[in-house]
Amino acid sequence: LFDVLTELRSRGVLWAINTGRELLHIEEGLREFNFPIDPDFVLTAEREVFHRGPGGQWQDFGDWNQRCYKAHDELYLRSGSLLHDILAFLDRDTKAHPIFEGDRIIGLAAENDAEMDRICEFLERERVRVPGFQYMRNTVYARFCHEDFSKGTALSELGRLTGISPEHIFAAGDHYNDLPMLDGRHARWVACPGNSVEAVKEMVTRTGGHVASHECSEGVVEALRHFGALSQGEIAA
């Protein structure tokens, strides 16, 4: 994958990491895996958008992040009763652990996938009580969020800021929190590696994308080759 990214970069292609991880963990990961080239952008916490500033540090790209923080503060002000009931459910009916940021519950960690499935069923039923309340699942973790801010909408905002339309954006993902960016609205070219969860494979198939036979990064390279990006330069970002 590194060789492919280097080749695409030489042809003017921009690339971004779109992840549920926080910005600090992105920097740690880039150092740990010794990436030969830095991403042009990082989209973090499933909703934030950053680019390199003049001094080389990651900084907010536009006002998206500030709008995101404001929307989440307002959401939490309206969600007290719902969050109280979520905590009660976790304590009463599960072995899951709530995750706090200060005194605010921002998500949870379940014991296993089966328990997480059951918790998600509960969240789906209850979240309708608060307009805009959503959650993002990744393995046995869930993060509470505003439905207007996801990997998908963050990717669309990046496209708007860079002047790149969805017709020229490729996106690949493998887990539940990738679903919002793989529905065909934010990227015309979508794919997933062979080790993706079934929900992602189904989404990619419905949107006319490519479900790779190879796993992990090899699956991403397979998808880029499938779409002709490695030989014809059809994908601009």
Model-derived features with residue positions:
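Active-site phosphate-binding/coordination module
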Residues: 1-91
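Conserved acidic, metal-coordinating active-site core of Asp-based
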Residues: 83-170, 176-184
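Residues at the C-termini of beta-strands that transition into short coil/loop
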Residues: 43-46, 53, 139, 194, ...
